């Protein structure tokens, strides 16, 4: 497994194809490209193929948030998510916040994360 911190050249089309295998959606290529350019991208690759990704949005000083931690289903339970979290902790100067999907709290706690703020969402008006 090859891990990269700060993969600024992460291809938007590749990321969309990867993300759709986990969270199927109609992702916009240009918006995805813009989003990837604004985050610290940590990747896990096997044979050059993207199999895991953790993205961090940060001001570089006070606050950072993990926007997502994604690992392809067939690569889960191999330590990839744990390795990406460890790299995030080692390469981010800020405290990291994130929301966890229900049922995954144990994974995060085993990886040294602790419960913090309650999460809320403001949905865009349609």
Regions found by a protein language model. Name each.
Residues 1-29, 119, 126:
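Short amphipathic alpha-helix that is part of the acyltransferase structural core
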Residues 95-99, 109, 114-126:
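Conserved catalytic-core motifs of GNAT/GCN5-like acyltransferases
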Residues 71, 77-90:
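Conserved acetyl-CoA-binding loop-helix of GNAT-fold acetyltransferases
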Residues 34, 39-54:
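Conserved beta-hairpin
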Residues 85, 90-103:
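Conserved GNAT acetyl-CoA-binding A-motif
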Residues 56-66, 76:
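A conserved beta-turn-beta hairpin within the catalytic core of GNAT-like acetyltransferases
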